[in-house]
Amino acid sequence: MSKLFGNKSQRDLKEVKPFVDKIKVAYGEIERLSDDDLRGRTAILRQKIQDYVKDERAEIDKLKVEVEGKDLDEREEIWAQVDKLEKEILDKMEVVLDEILPEAFAIIKDTARRFAQNETIRVKATDLDRDLAINHDFVSIEGDTAVYQNHWVAGGNEILWDMIHYDVQLIGGTVLHKGKIAEMATGEGKTLVATLPVFLNALTGNGVHVVTVNDYLSKRDSEWMGPLYMFHGLTVDCIDKHQPNSDARRKAYNADITFGTNNEFGFDYLRDNMATSPKDLVQRKHNYAIVDEVDSVLIDDARTPLIISGPTPKGEDQLFEEFLPNVEKVVEAQRKLCSQLLIDAKNKMASEDKKEQEEGSLLLFRSFKGLPKNKQLIKYLSEPGIKSSMLKTEEAYMAENMRNMHLVTDELYFIIDEKRNSVELTEKGIDLLTSRTDDPKFFVLPDIAAELSALDNMESDAEKRREAKDEIIANYSIKSERVHTVNQLLKAYALFEKDDQYVVMDNKVLIVDEQTGRIMDGRRYSDGLHQAIEAKEHVKVEAATQTFATITLQNYFRMYHKLAGMTGTAETEAGELWDIYKLDVVVIPTNKPIARKDMNDRIYKTAREKYAAVIEEIVRLVEEGRPVLVGTTSVEISELLSRMLRLRGIQHNVLNAKLHQKEAEIVAQAGQKGTVTIATNMAGRGTDIKLSAEVKKAGGLAIIGTERHESRRVDRQLRGRSGRQGDPGSSIFYVSLEDHLMRLFATEKIASLMDRLGFKEGEVLENNMLSKSVERAQKKVEENNFGIRKHLLEYDDVMNSQREVIYTRRRHALMGERIGMDVLNTIYDVCKALIDNYAEANDFEGFKEDLMRALAIESPITQEIFRGKKAEELTDMLFDEAYKSFQRKMDLIAEVAHPVVHQVFETQAAVYERILIPITDGKRVYNIGCNLREADETQGKSIIKEFEKAIVLHTIDESWKEHLREMDELRNSVQNASYENKDPLLIYKLESYELFRKMVEAMNRKTVAILMRARIPVPEAPSQEELEHRRQIEIRHAAEQRTDMSKYRTQKDDIEAQQKAQRDAASRPQGAAAPQTPIRNENKIGRNDPCPCGSGKKFKQCHGRNL
């Protein structure tokens, strides 16, 4: 088939070739233009785009004027037309962009040529040139002439522009414009490629986002490529240079081209959806994004949702430090036990007796289940025949659905499953844990379902049963938190290692990204795991927080009208990128053939031998005068190799999560003669390693990988550091049987193959079969990780549909354009819910009572009509009356407020711009800020609009915050469904829909209840003096109100919360719901304090029992 139709890469290039041919034709014409005429072409293209969509824009403006004064149904139709026209504008713009692509690409290519070939470019000065000259050294003004230099500072270094786009870069640029992923090898100039589609799409004025993996690159690239865009009158900024929620960041988003990191784009979106004033918003609509290192952002970072969290009153109330000694005791006992088991296993397996050997294999397997990372165990398993013997034992005990596995694990204190990232306490472990307490069931969850069932069968009065039930639930809640704390502490000790998954710096636990080796600033493990690690490391245990807003990067980037990306390594993940983002991967050919030599893996028996061989290879390469880049997978290994090199007297640089400040400088020097650089996987994404002629002659940059990573993509990224633009180079990986990947995923087949080949200590093995086995193990892990990311997305998709509804409604309220329509819809929904709840049961009395609570009106419907009409007719009748009542109350507020507003405006308009109007629902006073002039000119109508906005925003934020907490609890509790042979995701979808429906219904009722009871508070018979006082004090000027974001914090919450099914289910009875741990907003009452109800009992024995 590929011979007949060509392979995918060939078909992709065939599709793009016509565009490249047209660009070359256009370039011939553009080259002949003067510098001023070249800039003039940009203005012509911008106008052409606007002219193409001017009819639709005019129609939208006309519809927005028409919508005022229309009834509810007509308003909805008009706004639907507006939404449709806005989508049509975007689609039409894509058509015109394709038309002008050859000319736009030719303009930016020729601009690059002119900067490369001329020290200065002189053009007629515009206002933008004059503004640029104030803050940028590369532009100066001489009379009416703007002089652009061809050198400027980018990322702290002076750069001389010397780049012109190659043909393959024109291909890459076209692919990016089409909303695809361009895979380009390292050194092929991805940053320059991006200038083509960025320039073209920025001409629309809708904004282009260039997304990078770190703030150094976002700042550097905005400064490096910025002058090319600025020369043509486009504005460029970088969000990472400015504080969140600041005017400077707002301005950065309004620029034609905005650079920034993925996290900050996502967090700004969440902050915008917590804003209480339109002036707090920073982002525009999501138009077009180009994601640099797209695999890192959309795949690696997609496993960790973005979260904005805030303080919670019970945040300090934690048990980690209290139970730490108990857990340390269990961990220490397990270490001693497993060490002894290993010694006994070795003795028995050395015996000639087959039965003794079998017993030894069982002891070895038991030691493995208890402490799989024990270095002595790992070393022993690399000896001939040992691992294959243990794997056979494991197979025997896993047979028949692990019926006999308890014979292996009963002797242990806890069981570790590295593959599933879980730890489970055994009965023996629980006994040791509780040995310090008086209660043998101190750390055991009660069977709540059985206890409640037994209670229901008791023959006692209802009041006693209720009290007993409250006691059972309170006990379960306390014990559940206790068990959860112990489980997390156990995980912190058993599965997380310092200088591997995390580092401790400045008395803080900082997570290290497993893919890049970088510190993940601001990110914390979820579900108490981070606090557990803090307790383990004896640093300050931070307070727990509550989620206020959350989104996955996957769903954030799917909001863009058009999304594209570029990377050196995406082909291996092409399936995932298409499945989740509908992004096609196109492999762009290199400008020059790759001359790098990729050698077979060298496989050693132990890690010690492997590292010794790595050091010898480094010494040999340095003697040849070649630079060496050594890639490691953890901080610990980079430090080990550094110590070994120091012993040999070899100078070197280390780049890891602890030593990352001079990253760009170290990577830039990594190509010099005899330079040795040890780096975790963070090394050099986005930074080129350039070689001198002398180094090229010696053989180029040598890459040494000290371990295969779980992802083939990360290995390809490391190899790709060498061999840029046809340079010579080499790459090789050193692997041992003790490596993490080999230990977890190497099968019995590999172990027995090693034995057959007679693999002895000190020997090196280069074998195609083994290399393929390593690659198969990597594929297994990749599939597993894809499953985790897809699973996370499936859960977040449920959340996303709810988030869209809430955020759309919130945005309408914030902007105010559609607030009137949304309020009327809310009143209608409440009316419909009231009729639906009572009409079917013919409960007219219940309906009347609930109607007074919800809408504060008498029933306009008689009992006869209530029983004789259809539900739809009843809803319409009720809505008509509710609408009239609402309108009367709003008119009355405007009528009462306007005279006072008018007086303040007449006498103090020069002093005050805004005014606060107090409005109450009888329970609470809301101070509504509005523009003084507008309030006077609209006869008080603008006050009503501001009041509606404030109430809708208030009820949405309160309801959504509580809903997020309930959704978190639901997500954890549904995992038990898998033990009942049910699909947890399906249960989650059904339950979450019901939760959301109830939340919206309650939110609607709360909104309407406040609006329908609204009035301006007026004291009875006020004296003239009091009236004057109220006018001056109660109705006073108000400064511009802005949202205070300082009390919220951002974090990238680890996927850990989504992987806790096994441990939760293991410690919770089947069918029992996860305990609710309510986050309360009132002052905290101690459990031993007197109950505030006045009973004289302690709080824990009275109203505190069910908390």
From Swiss-Prot:
It is found in: Cell inner membrane; Cytoplasm. Keywords: ATP-binding, Cell inner membrane, Cell membrane, Cytoplasm, Membrane, Metal-binding, Nucleotide-binding, Protein transport, Translocase, Translocation, Transport, Zinc. Zn(2+) binds at C1091, C1093, C1102, H1103. Transmembrane segments: none annotated. It holds the Pfam family SEC-C. It is an enzyme of class 7 (translocase). It is a peripheral membrane protein. This is Protein translocase subunit SecA. The gene is secA.
